[in-house]
């Protein structure tokens, strides 16, 4: 079956998780009791249930949903579109960006910064410090949760989860302020490490930490410079299934000719998603619809119309468009399912220059980091690493963002006819993974491989 449509897909999955530090923390607020070192830190063989128990200590009360928090999420969504399109898509491969991970890492930088440096970071994020400090705990809380039902007797069901873990890595002997550390551990539930960055095993330890937090899914070598004084790091991990019983999605009976970005075609069977309420949105440049996972993550596909490409629609105007789907009219109630390919995507690069292009200057030369340290520091690198897999079994993704600071420098209708439609994703596409307007991963798929 020949396919002539180009596909732009947005995979949106924001999920709730109870915020938790990556190692057990007691209720003692003494900063020194929260600090780990090269010699004392040992990785736990932890699971999602133990994470949830720890989270009960740091977030014992659920903050009621408010209009203020909803407005905050809208601004997080706007930043997500801005950073995703600024990073763009690599020409030769599928790309994944985690706006949530970048937002968290840069928010921690804003917490540590002062003066002009803080102001520039906040302007890039599109929020005020008051908005950030008021809402960041709830954002952390919502991005750390076990997905789906589980009980103590069935720990396998707790493997589906979303985690958003923050950490502060400090050079052993660095002059840092306990008040700054306390802000990160209290508001961002950050782990704290004092490290000898000259030690030959420091990169191995950081890699092990990331691997531990992502259940082995992601294990990059960040290649820390010996001159590193402070590192602010965020790790995001997501694992989810399509349905309550963890069953694989079925494949189409016939093969489709998926058109890749370079105009070549890949003949393959596609996955059949479940029907969701609504009719695909069609605009001049693209059409879009979504498929959902068991716990409500939405994978939205943007498919360019004839004469347009993913380059024409991978922009903030499209990603920020809030036009609603049509769910029914005077005669019909609409149901649509997505027919889409399995795919994988990744990213691994220093995004410092991209962050500069968004208006941040002082962070990279003689910056004000006075809420954490009075030493002269500058940001030498912002490494962003991601990996995402969308398969018949479910979705798994992970991301790391590391900011490295160096020394110096309406009413229901009745009796409507049900209409069922297919939304076929049959060409290269853009995706966003989010839930509750919190984008976790965004990128472009230009080619699928069998």
In which residue ranges do the predicted regions lie?
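Non-catalytic, conformational "gating/processing" segments within enzyme and secreted inhibitor domains
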Residues: 92, 131-306, 327-415
């Amino acid at each position: 079956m020949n396919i002539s449509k180009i596909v732009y897909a947005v995979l949106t999955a924001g999920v709730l998780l109870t915020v938790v530090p990556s190692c057990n923390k007691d209720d003692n607020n003494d900063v020194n009791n929260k600090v780990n070192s090269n010699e004392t830190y040992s990785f736990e063989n932890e699971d999602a249930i133990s994470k949830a128990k720890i989270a009960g200590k740091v977030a014992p009360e659920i903050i009621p949903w408010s209009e203020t928090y909803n407005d905050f999420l809208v601004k997080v969504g706007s930043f997500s579109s801005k950073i995703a399109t600024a990073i763009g898509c690599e020409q030769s491969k599928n790309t994944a960006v985690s706006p949530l991970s970048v937002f968290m890492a840069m928010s921690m930088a804003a917490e540590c910064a002062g003066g002009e440096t803080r102001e520039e970071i906040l302007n890039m994020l599109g929020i005020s410090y008051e908005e950030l400090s008021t809402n960041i705990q709830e954002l952390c809380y919502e991005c750390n949760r076990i997905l789906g039902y589980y009980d103590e007797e069935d720990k396998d069901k707790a493997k589906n989860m979303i985690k958003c873990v923050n950490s502060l890595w400090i050079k052993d002997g660095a002059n840092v302020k306990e008040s700054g550390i306390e802000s990160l551990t209290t508001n961002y539930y950050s782990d704290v490490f004092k490290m000898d960055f000259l030690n030959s095993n420091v990169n191995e330890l950081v890699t092990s930490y990331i691997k531990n937090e992502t259940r082995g899914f992601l294990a990059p070598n960040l290649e820390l410079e010996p001159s590193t004084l402070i590192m602010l790091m965020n790790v995001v991990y997501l694992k989810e299934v399509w349905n309550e019983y963890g069953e694989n999605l079925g494949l189409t009976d016939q093969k489709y000719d998926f058109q890749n970005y370079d105009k070549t075609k890949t003949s393959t069977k596609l996955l059949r998603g479940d029907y969701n309420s609504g009719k695909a949105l069609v605009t001049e440049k693209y059409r879009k619809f979504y498929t959902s996972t068991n716990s409500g993550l939405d994978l939205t596909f943007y498919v360019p119309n004839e004469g347009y490409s993913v380059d024409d629609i991978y922009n903030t105007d499209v990603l920020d468009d809030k036009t609603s789907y049509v769910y029914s009219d005077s005669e019909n109630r609409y149901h649509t399912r997505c027919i889409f390919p399995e795919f994988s995507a990744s990213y691994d690069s220093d995004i410092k220059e991209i962050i500069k292009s968004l208006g941040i200057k002082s962070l990279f030369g003689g910056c004000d980091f006075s809420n954490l340290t009075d030493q002269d520091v500058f940001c030498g690198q912002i490494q962003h690493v991601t990996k995402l897999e969308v398969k018949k079994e479910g979705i798994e993704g992970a991301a790391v963002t590391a900011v490295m600071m160096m020394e110096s420098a309406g009413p229901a209708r009745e009796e409507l006819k049900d209409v069922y439609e297919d939304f076929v994703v049959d060409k290269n596409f853009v995706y966003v993974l989010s839930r509750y307007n919190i984008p976790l991963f965004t990128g472009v798929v230009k080619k699928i491989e069998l």
